[in-house]
Structure formats: structure tokens, C-alpha cells
């Protein structure tokens, strides 16, 4: 029996006598469309089955979180005193630890070295009604079983008799019905049920478990108000402002409210407001999922909806005609839309998690807030770049000019020059003006005349904040004007709670902004527009440009079209994606620097530092980066080590990975080929070393692959470096 040679999905690659076999095999492992013997139906079936595997991994991971906190954490102690006990993620078992290390990492009331949790899981589990380790073990066991079931389901759907057909996958209306009504709608309804039946009673000191949840009414009147139409009863008698969370002291009976603002003690949104929100979402999505025609011949066909989207003026060509077939037959288009949506949502999660904290006491755990914000912004930036990458692949592999004649897609391609040049102009304008202001202010600081800085108040943004009810700026408008219709309309509902929150300086809702915010806002706008320019140009030029009209014939990633055809290097759609990641990381750096520094000064009661130092570049370098890195360069000192030592090491390690990236990025392929050949020669001539023979002849990475390897090192190093800086500088100050 012949041994199977990697990659099994490509006979051609498997016969390659060089190390290219390994690298190209890894690079194309997930490009199902390019595999030998692949059919359209099989691609859909493989992706469908892999979704179950993905969910299985997610459930296993969350199960592990629950299990390790229950086993090695201090959840029950934390629940007794959330503000003073540090939450433990898990124990550290490390044979290299000497006594100083053991002492440094033994904290949070533990008996040995532990890691502190900065993910917010303690706050989340506490808010949703978990109180004991047994609750965590139960959740862990349930998710482990679910994980095994999903793994089995994935395997099952790969078996011949259980593979869905292509027509099943392309039944868009039924899928929308399932996803909107089933997944979004019913799960939101179920979550409302959990909040009402378990979380809200727990917040009022009442334990509801598997043994008593069928006999414990979440509201004294039960379902009577629902059947009689007296829904307002569920909002009457809410928790009072003096309510002590997790006790009956000051608690009410309301389960679905619209109080607005935050619970005064926990500084998080009211649980009854969140239950109301999820119920509303459930109703909307259950209805939305039933708008489309499935088995019963009622409702809309998506193709009819899209085909009727043609502007009556005739000025917008074919509108959405032909889009249904195009999208429904292109997995890359669908993935692009999904990634764009999820990326945007992920960024919104980052923004709302700190400004409107949903979990009890999250607002008091500064390191966790910083970690969650940074994590979600980084994830969002990568996902959104991926949306454009798959958009470009769609244009190369799936776009049919005949099918889309004159519609919105064709029109985007027809006037791409106007789109790209406008984006280019905006990026240049933002870049030169913002940098010009920063540099002018730097020079004025350097020459000792800070009063000559150009400082611009963000009046439009302040006006928007004022219209939402912020009184500080003195704009008498909308919600900040007691005489406005908007003010009086909501006065009896959510407005008092909201106004109290927005004008309270102890939270992060609509922070006070000034000239430093104005400048960094425009720096971030520059980053966003430049990233967008690179991505949009990459997608719109993916099929061809004036320089290379036949680009689509070369695929998504190609280095050049050989010698003798100038200008064809570095213009593939992949090159645009590759460049966009650098700009994306640059932008997310500015975003997180801004958020973190502004919050550090807010938490320390030292907002003047940000206001004064953020108007010039030297202020950012000196008073944010240098000043806050002291914890990182002090991890090891003559007095031994401390609990920040690991972050000091990660900080250095991150720089090392980042720097390694440049070895792949700033080097010509021929140089590496010559170097490898020299190394191979020296091995073959050296006794003992020449006992090891290569099966594959070593060759250098292709230009495209070296770019990928360099980009990955650059990104990973960048992330490690900033993560270490963020966590060490925040936890070093606030514990």
C-alpha cells in the first residue's frame, strides 16, 4: 500500500519534488474550490459540516472556562465581595517557578500561583444568576455534552446518506426563516426567559434552580397581565435606586422595564431593561423570519424583492436586478456580507461594553474593561479586512458581467475611478491636515510657547452629545433642553435615569471631549479611510485595471506576470489585502491608544494630563507610551520579580516576533534561495549532518507566501506587545 503524500487534495502538488509541496499544501488546504475532484455540491457540504465542528470547539472552550474557574478559581469568594476580591482564571503549574515567582503569582486568596481573569466572565456569570461553583460545573458538563453532540452531527453530515443536497443549501428563504426566527428570534426569547426566571430573581436574593423554577413565579401576577392585555403591570414597582444587588433590600417586582441609565450600586444596565430589550428583539426577529415564502406559498420571494429595487427615475440603472442569483450562487459574496456585518457588530460590542456596561461591577474592573475593548476592536479590524478579501475573490471567481448588466454591482465597477480617487483625496486631506496640526503643536511645545498651539474644540460632536442630554457644554438642545418636545415625551419613561447617567462623571457614557479628542478623532478617520481605500481599490480592481486588463485570469494572488511585462508586480487583490492589514493595525493602534489613555486619566482622576498632552505627538510618546511602560521595563529588578514579570517578558517577546516579520517582508526571494542552497551544500559536506537527507529539495518561499509569513509575524508581534503593555500598565495601577 502506497503511503499517502500530503496534500491528498491535490495530485499535482503531491508530486512536487521540492518543499513547495508543504507550503502550497498548507496555503490551499482551505481553498476547497481548487481541490481535485471538487464539485459545487461537495464544497457546500464540507463547509456545512465544518460549521458543526466550529461550534463544537466553541462549546468545548467555554466548557473549559467554566470548569477551570469552578475547580481552581474563587468564584464563590468573589460573589461575596466583587469589588475587593480579584477573580482567578485558573492555577499556574510551572516547574520553573522558584520561591519569588510562587510568591509573586499567589494572589486573590489562592494557596498557590494563579492567573487573574480579565475576560469579564465572573461579572457575566454573576449577572445572569450563577452563584455557586456547582452552577459552573453544571454549565461545564452541559456544554461538554453539547460539544460532543455537535462533533457527531458534523461527522454525520459528511456521511453519504446524510449530506444535504445543493438545492437545500440554495433555498435562501428557508434559511432566512431558520436563522432569523429560529436562531435569533427563539434564542432571544429563551434568553429573556432566563433573565426573567433566573437572573432577575437572583439579583433580588432569590435562588431559582432546576428544583424550583417551575413552581417559582417570576412575577406575583403570573401570566394574567399577558392574557388580559395589562402588560404595563410587568413594569410596575421596579427595583429602587437604593437596591443592593443580589439581596431583597430595596428590590421591586417589575420584570420588563424601561428605566434607562444604570443600577446605582453595580453601575451596569438594569436587568429588567435588558430583559425587555431581548423580548423586543425576539418579537421582531420571529416576525422577520416569517416574511419570506417557504413551504406555504405565502410571503415574499427574495428574488422578487431585489428585482423590484429599481429606481423609478431610471438614473440608477438596473438597481438590484440580478443580485439574487449572483449572491445565492456565490459563497464568497455571502461570506463577504457576513464578515462585514459581524466585523461591524464586533466593533459596536467594543464601544458599548464600556459605555453601557451590561454586567454587574464590570465598570469597576478597569483591566477587564480595557482588555475587552481592545480585544473586540482588534477582532473587528481583522474580520472587516476579510470581508473585502472575499469580495475581491467574488469578483475574480464568481462575478458574471452578463447576469449583472447595468445593476448596482456593474455600476460600482463602471465608476470605480471616481470612488477610488475620492477616497484617495479624503485620505490625503485628513493625513496632511491632521499631521500638520500635530506637528505645529509639537514645535510650539518644543520652543516653549504652548499658548501658540492650534486647538480646535469639537463643536459638532459636543452638539451631538448635548442633543443626547449632556448639559456640560451649555447647548440648550433636544434632550439637554427641558423645553423641547423630545424632553417632555420621554420624561415619564427612561429619561430621568438616562440623564442622570449621561451627566455623571463616574462612568464612561459620552465622555467630555476637547481639542485632543478632535485631533485623534481625525487621525483615526485618516486610518479608517486609508484602510478602506486600499481594500476598496483591491476589490474593484480585482478583475482588471487599465494597467492590467486581464488581471482576473491570474487569480486572487499572483506575484507578477513574468519578465517583459512591466507594472504587473504587487497589484493582485491579495497584495491589497496584505497592505490593508498594516493600515488596519495602524488604525486600531491609534483607536486603542486613545481609548486607553483617556480612560487611565479618567480612572486616576487626572483628566488634565490627557487634555494637555494629547494635542501634540511628543505628548503621546512621552505621557502615554513611555510613562506607562515603566511597569514593563521593571518586571525584573534588583529586588527580584513581581506579578508583572510575565508581561515584561511577553512585551520583549512580542517585539522579537514583530521584528522577525521584517526578515520576510524586506527581502528579495532570490537572496533566500541562494542562502538556502548554501546551507544545503554545507550540510551535505559536513560529517554527521549529512546523514540527514531531504526528501524534498529545499526552496525559498514564494514572494506571495513570504508576504503572508511576514504579515503574520508582524501582526502577532504587534498584538503580543500591546496586550502586554495594556494589561501590565492597567493592572499595575489598579490591581
Curated annotation (Swiss-Prot):
<dbReference type="InterPro" id="IPR020586">
    <property type="entry name" value="PSI_PsaA/B_CS"/>
</dbReference>
<feature type="binding site" description="axial binding residue">
    <location>
        <position position="655"/>
    </location>
    <ligand>
        <name>chlorophyll a B1</name>
    </ligand>
</feature>
<feature type="binding site">
    <location>
        <position position="671"/>
    </location>
    <ligand>
        <name>chlorophyll a B3</name>
    </ligand>
</feature>
<feature type="transmembrane region" description="Helical; Name=XI">
    <location>
        <begin position="708"/>
        <end position="728"/>
    </location>
</feature>
<feature type="binding site" description="axial binding residue">
    <location>
        <position position="663"/>
    </location>
    <ligand>
        <name>chlorophyll a B3</name>
    </ligand>
</feature>
<dbReference type="InterPro" id="IPR036408">
    <property type="entry name" value="PSI_PsaA/B_sf"/>
</dbReference>
<dbReference type="InterPro" id="IPR006244">
    <property type="entry name" value="PSI_PsaB"/>
</dbReference>
<keyword id="KW-0479">Metal-binding</keyword>
<dbReference type="GO" id="GO:0015979">
    <property type="term" value="P:photosynthesis"/>
</dbReference>
<feature type="transmembrane region" description="Helical; Name=III">
    <location>
        <begin position="176"/>
        <end position="200"/>
    </location>
</feature>
<feature type="transmembrane region" description="Helical; Name=IX">
    <location>
        <begin position="576"/>
        <end position="597"/>
    </location>
</feature>
<feature type="binding site">
    <location>
        <position position="672"/>
    </location>
    <ligand>
        <name>phylloquinone</name>
    </ligand>
</feature>
<keyword id="KW-0812">Transmembrane</keyword>
<feature type="transmembrane region" description="Helical; Name=I">
    <location>
        <begin position="47"/>
        <end position="70"/>
    </location>
</feature>
<feature type="transmembrane region" description="Helical; Name=VII">
    <location>
        <begin position="418"/>
        <end position="440"/>
    </location>
</feature>
<feature type="binding site">
    <location>
        <position position="569"/>
    </location>
    <ligand>
        <name>[4Fe-4S] cluster</name>
    </ligand>
</feature>
<keyword id="KW-0472">Membrane</keyword>
<keyword id="KW-0157">Chromophore</keyword>
<protein>
    <recommendedName>
        <fullName>Photosystem I P700 chlorophyll a apoprotein A2</fullName>
        <ecNumber>1.97.1.12</ecNumber>
    </recommendedName>
</protein>
<keyword id="KW-0460">Magnesium</keyword>
<dbReference type="GO" id="GO:0016168">
    <property type="term" value="F:chlorophyll binding"/>
</dbReference>
<feature type="transmembrane region" description="Helical; Name=X">
    <location>
        <begin position="644"/>
        <end position="666"/>
    </location>
</feature>
<dbReference type="GO" id="GO:0009055">
    <property type="term" value="F:electron transfer activity"/>
</dbReference>
<keyword id="KW-0793">Thylakoid</keyword>
<feature type="transmembrane region" description="Helical; Name=IV">
    <location>
        <begin position="274"/>
        <end position="292"/>
    </location>
</feature>
<feature type="transmembrane region" description="Helical; Name=VIII">
    <location>
        <begin position="518"/>
        <end position="536"/>
    </location>
</feature>
<keyword id="KW-0813">Transport</keyword>
<feature type="transmembrane region" description="Helical; Name=II">
    <location>
        <begin position="136"/>
        <end position="159"/>
    </location>
</feature>
<keyword id="KW-0560">Oxidoreductase</keyword>
<feature type="binding site">
    <location>
        <position position="560"/>
    </location>
    <ligand>
        <name>[4Fe-4S] cluster</name>
    </ligand>
</feature>
<keyword id="KW-0602">Photosynthesis</keyword>
<comment type="similarity">
    <text>Belongs to the PsaA/PsaB family.</text>
</comment>
<keyword id="KW-0408">Iron</keyword>
<comment type="subunit">
    <text>The PsaA/B heterodimer binds the P700 chlorophyll special pair and subsequent electron acceptors. PSI consists of a core antenna complex that captures photons, and an electron transfer chain that converts photonic excitation into a charge separation. The eukaryotic PSI reaction center is composed of at least 11 subunits.</text>
</comment>
<keyword id="KW-0934">Plastid</keyword>
<comment type="function">
    <text>PsaA and PsaB bind P700, the primary electron donor of photosystem I (PSI), as well as the electron acceptors A0, A1 and FX. PSI is a plastocyanin/cytochrome c6-ferredoxin oxidoreductase, converting photonic excitation into a charge separation, which transfers an electron from the donor P700 chlorophyll pair to the spectroscopically characterized acceptors A0, A1, FX, FA and FB in turn. Oxidized P700 is reduced on the lumenal side of the thylakoid membrane by plastocyanin or cytochrome c6.</text>
</comment>
<feature type="transmembrane region" description="Helical; Name=VI">
    <location>
        <begin position="370"/>
        <end position="396"/>
    </location>
</feature>
<dbReference type="GO" id="GO:0009522">
    <property type="term" value="C:photosystem I"/>
</dbReference>
<dbReference type="GO" id="GO:0000287">
    <property type="term" value="F:magnesium ion binding"/>
</dbReference>
<feature type="transmembrane region" description="Helical; Name=V">
    <location>
        <begin position="331"/>
        <end position="354"/>
    </location>
</feature>
<keyword id="KW-0249">Electron transport</keyword>
<dbReference type="GO" id="GO:0051539">
    <property type="term" value="F:4 iron, 4 sulfur cluster binding"/>
</dbReference>
